[in-house]
């Protein structure tokens, strides 16, 4: 049976794969308009929040908008309803539409903007282009009655523990005998007050990023049958989980720069691209960074990219790219629209696992300000 859900629960689900901790310092993320403490039935994912986006949300009875670009990015000195920005906020409040922004945290996230762009290009052996976040790993060891091992292991895996490379739900189990004596006031799941109890238990071990500790412990306590859960958490000596902006990987087959530029235009479904470099130069290794990636041309070159795909390329940065021998293809900032469908599908799948009664869909409003002649 499906469960009613509120906005806070949807955002908690969203932040499992795109936590606020991933955002670069000073980014304007999180709830920007309205409240999450209300029931939601319809959630719309959009790249931009413009007045026409809000009109679409009103028409489709949307309760919550999840946007990549924050509608409130610079401090507001006033909100006047005879200006577009003020009307946008007024409409959201009047129609009880909450607006939540996930900007650079969604760029960085696994399955976020840059992964979607790399996937659209069919890149293999992908790595982070610009590291921005390092998350040390921790290990959890918990003692579980034998018949409840599977339920706890599944809950921990679903909460994000046990993720190693391209594998999820990784864990190790070993059997033993646990002992305890319930004292006055205890309500033991097994045993009697004042009597020593010996129980066949399983020691279950798994790893998780430190940033997910609260989520993992919450899942542990919810799934574990004991009143008082015996568990240990400790740091492990292994490379921290590295996250960041952009991706770099290899094409499935070599192309010329011109062929690749047309390939980008098709895969990103844009009306045109700009290209820097010799048309017939060979392209195999590709760096891609959604949005404005002007400041990262040197990182792309240092990591061996034959071509750098990014938006909003500046005139003088294009000259710099030419001088260092880096090809560039600029599909525009609007190439990030790929996040609408990708994010909506990912969040829909996660909500389905929770059996939430909610509809999550991509906005259909075209917010690209540019027309190509």
Q: What do the PLM-derived regions correspond to, one by one?
A:
Residues 1-373:
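Hydrophobic structural segments
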């Amino acid at each position: 049976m499906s469960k009613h859900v509120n906005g806070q629960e949807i955002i908690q689900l969203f932040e499992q794969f795109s936590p606020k901790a991933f955002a670069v310092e000073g980014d304007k993320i999180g709830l920007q308009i309205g409240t999450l403490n209300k029931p939601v039935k319809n959630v719309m994912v959009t790249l931009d929040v413009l007045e026409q986006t809000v009109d679409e949300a009103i028409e489709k009875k949307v309760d919550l908008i999840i946007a990549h670009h924050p509608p409130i990015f610079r401090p507001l000195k006033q909100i006047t309803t005879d200006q577009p920005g003020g009307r946008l906020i007024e409409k959201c409040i009047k129609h009880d539409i909450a607006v939540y922004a996930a900007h650079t945290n969604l760029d960085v996230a696994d399955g976020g903007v840059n992964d979607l762009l790399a996937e659209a290009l069919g890149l293999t052996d992908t790595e982070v282009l610009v590291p921005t976040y390092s998350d040390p790993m921790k290990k959890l060891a918990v003692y579980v009655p034998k018949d409840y091992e599977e339920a706890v292991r599944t809950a921990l895996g679903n909460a994000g523990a046990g993720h190693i490379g391209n594998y999820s739900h990784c864990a190790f189990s070993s059997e033993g005998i646990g002992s305890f004596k319930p004292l006055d006031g205890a309500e033991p799941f097994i045993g009697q007050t004042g009597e020593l109890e010996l129980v066949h238990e399983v020691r279950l071990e798994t790893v998780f990023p430190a940033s997910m500790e609260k989520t993992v412990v919450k899942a542990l306590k919810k799934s574990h049958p004991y009143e008082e859960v015996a568990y240990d958490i400790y740091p492990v000596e292994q490379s921290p989980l590295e996250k960041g902006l952009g991706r770099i990987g290899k094409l499935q087959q070599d192309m010329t720069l011109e062929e690749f530029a047309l390939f980008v235009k098709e895969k990103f479904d844009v009306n045109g691209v700009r290209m820097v470099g010799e048309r017939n130069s060979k392209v195999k290794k590709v760096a891609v960074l959604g949005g404005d990636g002007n400041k990262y041309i040197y990182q792309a070159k240092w990591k061996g990219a034959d071509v750098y795909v990014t938006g909003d390329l500046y005139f003088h940065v294009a000259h710099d790219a030419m001088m260092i021998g880096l090809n560039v293809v600029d599909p525009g900032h609007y190439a990030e629209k790929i996040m609408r469908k990708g994010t909506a599908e990912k969040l829909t799948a996660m909500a389905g696992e929770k059996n939430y009664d909610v509809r999550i869909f991509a906005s259909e409003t075209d917010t690209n300000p540019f027309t190509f002649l």
